[in-house]
Amino acid sequence: MCIRDSSDIYSALKVASAYDFVSELPHGIDTIIGERGVTLSGGQRQRIAIARALLRKPSVLVLDDSTSAVDPKVEAEILQNIKTETNCSLLVIAHRLATIRLAERVIFIDDGKVSASGSHDELLKIDDYANLVSAYEDIKL
């Protein structure tokens, strides 16, 4: 894939909430990252990975715990940006309740099988799902 315009890169960085920290790197988007360059945090690496995926302009974007190292506020911002700024469907695999609550539709998998689907609030009426949510909330206390 050939990117003809750096505006595509900047747009993807903005959607992935990575634009600000990338702009502050010594050489911006041309900064060398890794062992011989600048070291990024786990959350920064995840946001760069999301931006790279968005550059391909996918019709479906699968995020498998792709924001686990990002704080919940930034994660919500990224998911909202993807929803409003792209034309792709988003499939999110998540364990964080804050992420699950943001979803339009949740597919609850229990013992390797689809047990139920619906909104988070709808699924709270199902005992197994409600018990799982309660267990996660108890852990945070």
Each model region followed by its residue ranges:
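Short, small-residue-biased leader/transition segments that mark boundaries at the very start
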Residues: 1-3, 93
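ABC ATPase nucleotide-binding domain helical subdomain, centered on the C-loop/LSGGQ "ABC signature"
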Residues: 4-35, 79-80, 87, 126
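C-terminal portion of ABC ATPase nucleotide-binding domains
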Residues: 24-28, 80, 101-141
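A short, proline-enriched helix->beta-strand linker immediately N-terminal to the Walker B motif
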Residues: 55-59
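Catalytic Walker B motif of ABC-type/P-loop ATPase nucleotide-binding domains
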Residues: 61-64
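Helix N-cap at the start of a conserved alpha-helix in ABC-type nucleotide-binding domains
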Residues: 72-74
